Amino acid sequence: FIPFARLDDIMVSYAAPGGNVGPHYDSYDVFLLQGSGSRKWQVSGSHSLDLIPNQELRILKSFVPEGQCEVTAGDILYLPPNFSHYGVALEPCFTYSIGFIAPIFDHVKSEFLHYLDAEFELPGIFQDPTRKATDQPGLIPDDLLQAVTEQVSRIKWTKNNILKFTGEFLTQSAANYQSLPPNILSKKKFLSQLSSTSYQIESTVKFLYREQFGFIGGNAFKIPTSSQSIFRQFANTRLIHGHAIQPDSFLAETIFEWLSQGYVRSIKT
């Protein structure tokens, strides 16, 4: 029921009695699903920005709880962005932390400008062969400013540019992402096994779609009209059975490529 575009990661942690990482906060929405065992949580909507240095998490130097609860298997605790929390295991337990993407718009701006840099070219260089001597050498010349204005004004983007950028941005692999080893398989063998194999999107890979585009691994591709329905089904379920795939289809060709890139895994059925 949650859009994959919003899901960041799921982390599983084990703690012995008394185990904890210290009071900290995250800059995005988090659901904490309690697995086996139990844990005591203290939470606060306000916190000091004074952090313990050189820590992977934002560990607070001081923490004053505003509420607390004890959770057991199956309980879920929701934490809004920047809500500090401190969990201590009451017995051996597993906790599943489900994090959500919350793009920082200034970062989006920077990434979009990089995208535009790759998408657009402004050929040529400024020339002024008829330049005359000036008695104001510190002044930016009118023709130079006008030339830059005209060239920069040529950079325009469309709805499709924004859509493609958004899909590529949301499906980029995390810095610590480790892909599956490439599945080295000949095309002939792949096709011979197609009907008896299922294909699943690898757990750390995002596969999204919108309109005629698909997005995976930070790349956009256009989906033929005849293949859009089955691609959307694959993206929504993240699993497809080979008997539903035509051997000569765009989807079969795409899955063959994704196997070699570690985006999907094959499952014998």
Where do the model's predicted regions map?
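Short capping segments at the starts of secondary-structure elements
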Residues: 232-244
